[in-house]
Curated annotation (Swiss-Prot):
One of its GO terms (molecular function) is phosphomannomutase activity. The keyword NADP does not apply. This is Phosphomannomutase. Catalyzes the interconversion of mannose-6-phosphate to mannose-1-phosphate, the precursor for the synthesis of GDP-mannose. GDP-mannose is an essential sugar nucleotide for the synthesis of D-mannose-containing cell wall polysaccharides (galactomannans and glucomannans), glycolipids, glycoproteins and the antioxidant L-ascorbate. It catalyses: alpha-D-mannose 1-phosphate = D-mannose 6-phosphate. It comes from Oryza sativa subsp. indica (Rice). The active site is at D14 (nucleophile), D16 (proton donor/acceptor). The gene is PMM.
Length: 248
């Protein structure tokens, strides 16, 4: 790749709602735009999902399409296609504490009265648990319906409140993201975790859609190490990037 205009500047992107519509595949136009953006600045992506799910959205070559690819908030880190770091929830918490948390959560979901339930209520990832009251096996239509229902009935915020109080001794962070679930991970394992790999950059611009308190982009958006930008859609992301990096 030819020398970039601003190699010391990093543009770092959330995935869901920022580069793609929620849980949808990236458009060819957006992929082409990101390719053009790499001619101007260094580019990275950071998502809460594991690498398999991020690859489903951004393509199988995601670790080489961007200079940095951080899955599970950076707990699994790639630079130029090479794995540069991993961290494990199991080794950090231990099986006994994990089991206690999972058992309580499944009991809570079992007693939850919501219109529908499907399957995969807890997804165990290397660096976090993803908890979904409706279950991740639901269809896109069911996802959309649950998101509307949750906005009225606060199913996820209420559940997070109960779990936060019950497991205060574990020092966990609860982060509501996407349409149907929330992530659970040790304090400090939010998206700011990936910043440890980015010390060389003088300027880091972060783009995300859930930048409000409690959203899974909040901590990195507010970090002293980043310049935060709230976006509303992939089109808005592209528009802001054009204005910031490509208009000079």
């Amino acid at each position: 790749m030819a020398a970039r205009k601003n190699a010391g500047v990093l543009a770092l992107f959330d995935v869901d709602g920022t580069l793609t519509a929620p849980r949808k595949v990236v458009t060819p136009e957006m992929l082409q735009f990101m390719k053009q953006l790499r001619e101007h600045v260094t580019v990275g992506v950071v998502g809460g999902s594991d690498l398999v799910k991020i690859s489903e959205q951004l393509g199988k070559s995601v670790t080489t399409d961007y200079d940095y690819c951080f899955s599970e908030n950076g707990l699994v880190a790639h630079k130029n296609g090479e794995l540069i770091g991993t961290q494990s929830l199991k080794s950090f918490l231990g099986d006994d504490q994990l089991k206690e948390f999972i058992n309580f959560t499944l009991h809570y979901i079992a007693d939850l009265d919501i219109p529908i339930k499907r399957g995969t209520f807890i997804e165990f990832r290397s660096g976090m648990l993803n908890v979904s009251p409706i279950g991740r096996n639901c269809s896109q239509e069911e996802r959309d319906e649950f998101e509307k229902y949750d906005k009225v009935h606060n199913i996820r915020p209420k559940m997070v409140s109960v779990l936060r109080e019950k497991f205060a001794h574990l020092n966990l962070t609860f982060s509501i993201g996407g349409q149907i679930s929330f992530d659970v991970f040790p304090q400090g394992w939010d998206k700011t975790y990936c910043l440890r790999y980015l010390e060389e950059f003088q300027e880091i611009h972060f783009f995300g859609d859930k930048t409000y308190k409690g959203g899974n982009d909040y901590e990195i958006f507010e970090s002293d190490r980043t310049i935060g930008h709230t976006v509303t859609s992939p089109d808005d992301t592209a528009e802001q990037c054009r204005s910031l990096f490509m208009s000079k």
